[in-house]
Structure formats: structure tokens, C-alpha cells
Amino acid sequence: QGYFASHYPLIKLPGTFYNYSTGTTNILSLIMKNKLSQNGIDYYDFVEKNLLIPLGLKNTTLEFDKSDTFIGGSSVYASARDYAKFGYLYLRDGVWDGDQIISKDWVDMTRTPSKHTYNLYSNKFWHVNEFRENAFNFPTDTYYCAGFGGQYIMIIPSKDLIMVRLGETYNTSTNTLLSFLGEIIKEVPNI
């Protein structure tokens, strides 16, 4: 999928227009796989050594395409506890058990919405903007991963809160689901 997406023609020059695309995540996976393999490192072994094992993610599966490239835009399957650990890593500035797993600079950049995405997105995480805060009762520091069918890992630093939502909600609108999650978040006191 990364190979296919990387050979699709650009419609706009990079940095001039924002449109969400899962394909770009698959391109990043392909680039990462190629860089790692140039150094004799297997992609899965790298992820396992640097993320899965340190965080104790025992119920997490990554899906790879036929070219052995991680389908990064949609194919991480995990338990709610494992997703929560991933969110907690970001809540704690990339530190797990005293070890810096993800650089604080990366986490800070992830927490800062990109102006190129109308302040909606950064480093594969969605952000709350003024519209979403008002509509769904989210604190403005909320950022989250949103997966197919209504999977969410929500990180809310002002409440010291991680919220994971799993389930199949293909027939429920995103706004209905986010409104429901916002009502739950609203009841959690700020720290």
C-alpha cells in the first residue's frame, strides 16, 4: 500500500494544501521500512524492541501488506489496555518507566496543531480546535488518534486523562460519538 500511494500523482505541492490522507501514513511506513532495511534492521523487530517490549504491549498486532510494509494508516490492532499505554506514553512526555521512549520534542510537536491543517492535525494525531471544543466539551489541549469505525485514544493533559474507546460504530456519525465522549470528559475534573 505504501508503494501504491507513493506512486500516485500529487494534486498540490506539499505544504500548500491540506487534505487528510491515510496513504501518506503508508508512504511514511514504506520510507521507514526502507531506511531501516538499509541498516540491516527489520521493521517489526525495530518496533518490537523500541515500543512493544518497553511498554509491555502484549496484545498489539501490526498488519503488513504483501510487500512487508506496515499498513500504518489503519492496521494496528490492540487491547484497550495497550492503546491506553500508548496514550499514557504521550501524556508523560514520551517517558515510560524512567526511559525516554519517544523524544519530548516529538511529543511537543505532536501536541501542537499544525497551521497547515487548519489546526486540526499534527504528527498523525487529531486536535481540538475552537469549533470542536464548543461542540463536544473537549478541553482545548485534547489531542487524539481516531481509528476506523470509532476507535479513539484521547489524551487530555489538563485532566491528566487518557480515554480509550473501542467498538464498531459504522452507522453512528462521528459527531454523535464525539459528543458522547465529550460528555464523559466534561465530568472529569481538571488537575
Protein language model features and the residues they cover:
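Active-site Gly/Thr loop motif
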Residues: Y3, L57-N59, T112-V164
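Stable alpha-helical elements in mature extracytoplasmic
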Residues: Q1, T24, Y43, V47, ...
